[in-house]
């Protein structure tokens, strides 16, 4: 059964381009193209699409307002088409908080290779969105959430442990939820979230505002500090290396690994090699299998491994692959994951 797709964009060029890409795939059926939210509403009611690609910046009714109304009236898998501006990035994360499944930047097609790569990516995201679990809508929190009482971590744990997290589709909101449940005093945390360039800095700034931790986009060669969270920049691999007695970041522009740059496998492999048994790692919602190999190495080196449970995942791809490998010690739904990780870290002071 084909996946019914509706394209909503005020640009005729973008509509036709996306329509051309969708019609070239036998698994997808283009049921309509709308230039504004009013046309889109009629087409949603008429065609009942499985997936909608939605432009954020539209006349009359903007994409966020339409998305908000859609998710209340007829929840549907939505992939946002986002501009590479700071305002566009902010709007994108608001859209994900409102219930959009995923996003992709507007196409910049300067060569046939660009066209082919963009087509592969948008088709992959549409197909993944069609099978995604739509979460209950929740507005982006406006204030820092104060977590309930958490176990105190010893200074030894804070200064010797490393926490590593990997995610893809659905990960921006999952990471926010997880970090909001962590206390202000934690070991260094390194995160790879599949995301294109131009969005990771805004993502880090958003997390910094909405959690008790210090969150930043990682820079090359910086020392990892307790109470800080380091986000892999878009289109760069984030690795952790040990220099003297300190953990430091290394950013590289190497080939894609497991189909991605940044890659969760690259981060997890590096953490396993330099932190070994002092690693606590979690793999969250996402499509594909990136992170499974890295989790296997962390397990082999004696680290503690966690995976998000299927019920709370938007896409149960990456956690499933790691679980299938037999390298995950604890499978935990997102609401309980922070407590499980903290209880493990707190238990280390008694060892």
Curated annotation (Swiss-Prot):
Its EC number is 3.1.1.61, 3.5.1.44. Phosphorylated by CheA. Phosphorylation of the N-terminal regulatory domain activates the methylesterase activity. GO terms for biological process: chemotaxis. SUPFAM superfamilies: CheY-like (SSF52172), Methylesterase CheB, C-terminal domain (SSF52738). It catalyses: [protein]-L-glutamate 5-O-methyl ester + H2O = L-glutamyl-[protein] + methanol + H(+); L-glutaminyl-[protein] + H2O = L-glutamyl-[protein] + NH4(+). One of its GO terms (cellular component) is cytoplasm. It is an enzyme of class 3 (hydrolase). Gene3D superfamilies: 3.40.50.2300, Methylesterase CheB, C-terminal domain. Its main location: cytoplasm. The modification 4-aspartylphosphate is found at residue 55. It comes from Shewanella sp. (strain MR-4). This is Protein-glutamate methylesterase/protein-glutamine glutaminase 2.
């Amino acid at each position: 059964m084909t996946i019914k797709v509706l394209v909503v964009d005020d640009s005729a060029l973008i509509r036709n381009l996306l329509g051309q890409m969708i019609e070239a795939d036998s698994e997808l059926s283009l049921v309509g193209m709308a230039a504004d939210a009013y046309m889109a509403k009629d087409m949603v009611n008429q065609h009942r699409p499985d997936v909608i690609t939605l432009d954020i910046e539209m006349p009359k009714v903007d994409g966020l307002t339409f998305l908000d109304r859609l998710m209340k009236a007829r929840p549907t898998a939505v992939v946002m088409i986002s501009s590479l501006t700071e305002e566009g990035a902010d709007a994108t994360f608001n859209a994900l908080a409102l219930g959009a499944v995923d996003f992709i930047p507007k196409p910049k097609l300067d060569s046939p290779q660009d066209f082919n790569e963009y087509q592969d990516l948008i088709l992959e995201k549409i197909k993944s969105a069609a099978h995604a679990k739509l979460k209950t809508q929740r507005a982006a929190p406006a204030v820092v959430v104060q977590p309930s009482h958490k176990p105190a971590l010893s200074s030894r744990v804070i200064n010797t442990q490393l926490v590593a997290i990997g995610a893809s589709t659905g990960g921006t909101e999952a990471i926010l939820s997880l970090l909001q449940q962590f206390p202000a005093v934690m070991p260094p945390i390194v995160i790879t979230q599949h995301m294109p360039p131009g969005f990771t800095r805004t993502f880090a700034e958003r997390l910094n505002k909405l959690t008790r931790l210090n969150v930043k986009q990682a820079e090359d060669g910086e020392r990892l500090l307790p109470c800080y969270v380091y986000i892999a920049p878009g289109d760069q691999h984030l690795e952790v290396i040990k220099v003297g007695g300190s953990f430091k970041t290394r950013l590289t522009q190497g080939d894609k690994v497991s189909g991605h740059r940044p890659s969760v496998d690259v981060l997890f492999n590096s953490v396993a090699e330099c932190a070994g048994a002092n690693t606590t790692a979690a793999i969250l919602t996402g499509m594909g299998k990136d992170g499974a190999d890295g989790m296997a190495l962390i397990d082999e080196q004696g680290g503690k491994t966690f995976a998000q449970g299927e019920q709370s995942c938007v896409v149960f791809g990456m956690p499933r692959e790691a679980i299938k490998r037999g390298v995950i010690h604890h499978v935990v739904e997102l609401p309980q994951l922070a407590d499980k990780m903290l209880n493990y870290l707190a238990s280390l002071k008694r060892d």
